[in-house]
Design a protein with these regions (language model features):
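Alpha-helical transmembrane segments of integral membrane proteins
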Residues: 2-4, 16, 88-129, 143, ...
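Hydrophobic alpha-helical transmembrane segments of membrane transport/permease proteins
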Residues: 15-65, 155-174
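An internal, D/E-rich "acidic patch" concept
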Residues: 57-113
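A hydrophobic, multi-pass inner-membrane permease signature
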Residues: 138-146
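Peri-membrane helix termini and adjoining interfacial loops of integral membrane proteins
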Residues: 148-158, 249-256
């Protein structure tokens, strides 16, 4: 286990460095960042002053290492648009994003696990096919389109929920449904597949032969083992949810870190964009690393592979 953990740590570090290099390179995708920050009417003297202030006059590799060293210390510089430290902006917006992610995860698990259990208990039935249809639609439906449909339905046609904002719990209902529904199919399919495998195992057949009730066999023996892969997947999916929150928060005008990223992109606020993308990426890498360790602990064969 120690050797496997060391390998995963090394891989996580390499992936983190690669991601940081890609995020930093976004600064130069649109050309000279100093010119973009100065504006179209800026003089050459203004551009040179911005280059000196932000260190754009130094070699790119030096800029990268300085930026990475600052990022490791939580220092991302000052926001070009908001005129305040980037880390303070993110800390202020992050609770909204975390609240959305946690509520969406709870919604996804609460919907997918019962559906997966029913689909496994009644294979090839109407319930099973309805669950399969839900999975197909959930994977194929664009999240922004689904969000717009819910806004039209529940904020305008039947105005019972707000269309935008983040001041009360009502503002999180529609975003939670959209973000959680996108993750539901993966959990549902994994629950169904895992439960079908467990129900056909020898120890479950033995439990049935002992005269245990179907409910006791399901909840005490089968579901407890079938749900383990779902828990591992939840860690990875939570990282996906935080990344997907950029679109959802923008559509619903939730003032979280995802919406901050969109605001910063539209205003060419490079330091803030880089910080949000890097922190989201690192958080996802950490969750994936923890999920790998959990899988290896639960399934020793993974450590040998």
């Amino acid at each position: 286990m120690l050797l496997y953990t060391a390998k995963r740590i090394l891989l996580a570090i390499l992936v983190s460095l690669t991601v940081s290099a890609l995020v930093f390179s976004l600064l130069y995708l649109s050309g000279d960042p100093a010119t973009a920050l100065a504006g179209e009417r800026a003089s050459q003297a203004d551009i040179m002053a911005i280059k000196a202030a932000y260190g754009f006059d130094q070699p790119v590799y030096i800029q990268y290492f300085k930026w990475l060293a600052g990022a490791l210390q939580g220092e991302f510089g000052e926001s070009v648009y908001f005129r305040m430290p980037v880390i303070d902006l993110i800390v202020d917006r992050l609770p909204v994003t975390m609240m959305l992610g946690v509520s969406a995860m709870i919604f996804a698990l609460a919907l997918s696990i019962p559906l997966g259990v029913l689909a496994a208990m009644y294979p090839n039935s109407l319930i099973d096919r309805a669950a399969l249809l839900l999975a197909v639609v959930g994977q194929a439906l664009p999240s922004f389109w689904f969000a717009l449909m819910l806004i039209v339905l529940f904020a305008y046609w039947v105005p019972i929920l707000p269309a935008s904002g983040s001041d009360s719990w009502q503002h999180f209902v529609l975003p939670t449904i959209v973000l959680g529904y996108y993750a539901t199919p993966a959990f549902m399919r994994l629950t169904r597949t895992g439960l079908l495998d467990v129900l056909s195992s020898d120890y479950v057949r033995t439990a049935r032969a002992k005269g245990l009730s179907p409910a006791k066999v399901l909840f005490k023996h089968a579901l407890r083992n079938a749900i383990i892969p779902v828990v591992s997947l939840a860690a990875v999916q939570f990282g996906f949810m935080l990344t997907g929150s950029i679109i959802i928060e923008t559509v619903f005008a939730l003032h979280g870190a995802g919406f901050l990223a969109w605001e910063s992109i539209s205003r060419s606020d490079f330091p803030t964009v880089q910080a949000v993308l890097l922190l989201f990426s690192w958080f996802y890498i950490i969750l994936t690393f923890l999920a790998d360790l959990l899988n290896a602990w639960l399934n020793p064969r993974i450590r040998v592979a």
